[in-house]
Amino acid sequence: MAIERGSKVKILRKESYWYGDVGTVASIDKSGIIYPVIVRFNKVNYNGFSGSAGGLNTNNFAEHELEVVG
């Protein structure tokens, strides 16, 4: 099954904050960059300023670091 926009994917990159989590593909860059797939998650990571609830809820991945689920 090919990865496309809107697909639900499981993260296989072990050093990622979202390892094992499921996110939604927001976009796929076709220009040949190393990490072309932008994945959006429901929770934010640990980045942010002290005292703020901010953080990132997207990250770039290579296609081999993702597994399509359902």
UniProtKB/Swiss-Prot annotation:
The keyword Thylakoid applies. Keywords: Membrane, Photosynthesis, Photosystem I, Thylakoid. InterPro entries: Elect_transpt_acc-like_dom_sf, PSI_PsaE. It is a peripheral membrane protein. The keyword Repeat does not apply. It holds the Pfam family PSI_PsaE. It is found in: Cellular thylakoid membrane. GO terms for biological process: photosynthesis. One of its GO terms (cellular component) is plasma membrane-derived thylakoid membrane. Its main location: membrane. Belongs to the PsaE family. Stabilizes the interaction between PsaC and the PSI core, assists the docking of the ferredoxin to PSI and interacts with ferredoxin-NADP oxidoreductase. NCBIfam families: PRK02749.1. This is Photosystem I reaction center subunit IV. The lineage of its organism: Bacteria, Bacillati, Cyanobacteriota, Cyanophyceae, Oscillatoriophycideae.
